[in-house]
Amino acid sequence: MKRDFLGRTLAVIEDLSVEEQMFLYEKTRELKQRWYSGEDVSDFRIKKRNVGIYIVFVEPSTRTKESFINAAKFHSGPNVKVNVFDSEHSSFNKQESYTDTFSMLTGYSDYSIFVVRTRLEGVCRLLERRISEFASRNGIEVPSFINAGDGKHEHPTQELLDEYTFLEQNGFDNSFIHVALVGDLLHGRTVHSKVNGLKIFKNVKVDLVAPEELMMPEHYVEKMKKNGFEVRIFSSIREYLDQKDVAKIWYFTRLQLERMGEDILEKVHVLREAVTFKKEYLDALPEGVKFYHPLPRHKVYPTIPNFLDTLPLNGWETQARNGYWVRIVLLSMFGGALEAPFDTSKKEEKPEEDFIIPAPITHGSKGVQKEGKRGIKPIENGTVIDHIAKGKTPEEIYSTILKIRKILRLYDVDSADGIFRSSDGSFKGYISLPDRYLSKKEIKKLSAISPNTTVNIIKNSTVVEKYRIKLPPTIYGFEELRCKNENCITNPAHGENASPSFVRNEKGQFICEYCETPHSFEEIWSI
């Protein structure tokens, strides 16, 4: 049974299970207590030989970068070298890909831990996959990657220190938490990480306090509800304090003007007013409230104004210091210094659900002949794809037929297609492929292009096999796939030659596996 965390990646907070996160928090608590009482903490230091810790910040940062540098220096010694990567004068400026850069860096140590911050989203997930393959090819130990913030996607190590700080305030009781998230919930990646980070608490109540223009994206709100959180929404601090059930943990974020469009910037004064705390609000707060903030604060327009610095409300200073301790422990785990009392193997993927379902065959050849009478010549042998985009308009159906032909390369000379009216009055598409049998792989591809179709295998003018195809749980491996997020690492403009892949959620949306942007089925296709 694996008990170490070597080779693990933290791209999103869910890459650590709740059990693994709680282990990290308990070890952080232990480290702090032993450090401040003057006890030996050497067992937290990485002892594995020839380890390289690389701090690679392609996006500027002060707190996160310095926190990680100092956490890495805690481990620095004969066995561990700390490298602060100068991205401004690096091969990135020579248009080298992330994959090539990190492949070469991986070869300079027996084992590597990379701490990566980028404007592009999903970089650590890409590196986890690509560099694992590189390491396997070259007999190198698979490295670890830690996401130190990627665009407006996630900031999992900030989430770790936030949750640790919340636990401290709660006396390390994780039975319940009531937290208010206040500020720019649209662009703030730290609040996006809380969608899953708060799952360490058994009962969760979240109040979202932001005007509509800055409200948390709907797919994150839905995910909170799916996680069992009670979620309430308020448009301003004033509205929030007008009701009596006020949280004792407030988590503020700054307005990220650099990520906003012109339409939002025109309203910035009104938006800022809605989420900035004022002196007049103090009397409405319940006893024991603490304010937190991932920092930095805007020096002119802080959502937590400076008059609060000296009040007992100030929890953000302790929160910031906790980042050092949490990141030391995270590096201890990923560097092999700390082992868990439970299995730390990466959990197996769920088996893919069966989405190609054999269907009963009725009237063997009758159905084929029937289609022939409506304009398509019946075939003796081959494949008939039926019920294409059933219920859609003729224009949409024909577009789907063209998509199927292009992606599956169904350019057979004798093939035919058409649009017919079903017995229920709706339209459906139809492709007839004489002497051509679709392979199982092609049928799987078809399910991704046009779900809910029917595939008929015909021999001697008789339907001998029939399949009904459902929407697959994952879609990948097509050149025509595109993530609509321009900042996703898979976007062709970024030159990483990364193929998008999508996972279907319970609502039928397809979530990019790199940046977690939700898409409709139609949106994932570039044709």
Curated annotation (Swiss-Prot):
Region span, Aspartate carbamoyltransferase: 1-342
Region annotation Linker: where it falls in the sequence: 343-357
Region annotation (Aspartate carbamoyltransferase regulatory region) ranges: 368-527
GO cellular component terms, semicolon-separated: aspartate carbamoyltransferase complex
EC number: 2.1.3.2
Protein's GO biological process: 'de novo' pyrimidine nucleobase biosynthetic process; 'de novo' UMP biosynthetic process; amino acid metabolic process
InterPro entries: Asp/Orn_carbamoyltranf_P-bd, Asp/Orn_carbamoylTrfase, Asp/Orn_carbamoylTrfase_sf, Asp_carbamoyltransf, Asp_carbamoyltransf_Asp/Orn-bd, Asp_carbamoyltransf_reg_N, Asp_carbamoylTrfase_reg, Asp_carbamoyltrfase_reg_C
Top enzyme category: transferase
Reaction it catalyzes: carbamoyl phosphate + L-aspartate = N-carbamoyl-L-aspartate + phosphate + H(+)
Keywords: Metal-binding, Multifunctional enzyme, Pyrimidine biosynthesis, Transferase, Zinc
Pathway in which the depicted protein is active: Pyrimidine metabolism; UMP biosynthesis via de novo pathway; (S)-dihydroorotate from bicarbonate: step 2/3
Signal sequence, renumbered to the chain: none
Keyword Zinc set for record: yes
Gene Ontology MF term list: amino acid binding; aspartate carbamoyltransferase activity; metal ion binding
UniProt-annotated binding residues for Zn(2+): C483, C488, C512, C515
Family: In the N-terminal section; belongs to the aspartate/ornithine carbamoyltransferase superfamily. ATCase family.
Protein name: Protein PyrBI
Gene: pyrBI
